UniProtKB/Swiss-Prot annotation:
One of its GO terms (biological process) is cytoplasmic translation. Keywords: Ribonucleoprotein, Ribosomal protein, RNA-binding, rRNA-binding. This is Large ribosomal subunit protein uL22. Signal peptide: none annotated. The gene is rpl22. SUPFAM superfamilies: Ribosomal protein L22.
Length: 157
């Protein structure tokens, strides 16, 4: 695993950060969730993502929305699009990461309930290569993508 740095170099007394490398979820789903949780309060983001895990609310898909069906839980006025899905694995990883950033904020002496997500980014991680045996002695490549996710929280007054 390669050591990676934060893409945003924000520092300060009211900043808390968390990062996870090479997660086993879809990079496209991670990008869409990062777009969703950016500028949300941390507790609100966790509550929304827990509803996504329970398949109650959908994540709006803005970028990777080709052939994505419209969801009743999304109205076009709130998010600007009605296309969405329920990325359960990526949502669970984001919940774990946001809670980790809140614990880092608590350790730094900040109030975790007053934290807002000012930066959320998802980048492609390492591709784990594999092969899938086929008939007649052939083989098909079977690659598994990973994703690097980072969250930065700031305390609001």
């Amino acid at each position: 695993m390669a050591r990676t740095e934060y893409s945003n170099k924000l520092t300060g007394d009211n900043i808390a950060r968390a990062k996870a490398n090479e997660l086993g979820c879809s990079p496209k789903h991670a990008v869409e969730i990062a777009h969703l949780v950016r500028n949300m309060m941390a507790d609100d983001a966790v509550a929304y993502l827990e509803q996504v895990i329970d398949l109650k609310r959908a994540v709006p898909f803005h970028r990777f929305n080709r052939n994505v069906s419209h969801q009743k839980s999304l109205n076009g006025k709130t998010f600007g699009t009605a296309a969405g899905r329920y990325p359960v694995k990526a949502a669970a990883e984001y919940v774990r990461l946001i809670r980790s950033a809140q614990k880092n904020a608590e350790y730094a002496g900040l109030a975790p309930e007053k934290m807002v997500i000012i930066h959320a980014a998802a980048n492609k991680g390492r591709c784990i290569k594999g092969i899938f045996p086929r008939a007649m002695g052939r083989a098909t490549p079977k690659h598994k993508d990973s994703v690097n996710v980072e969250i930065i929280l700031r305390e609001v007054q």
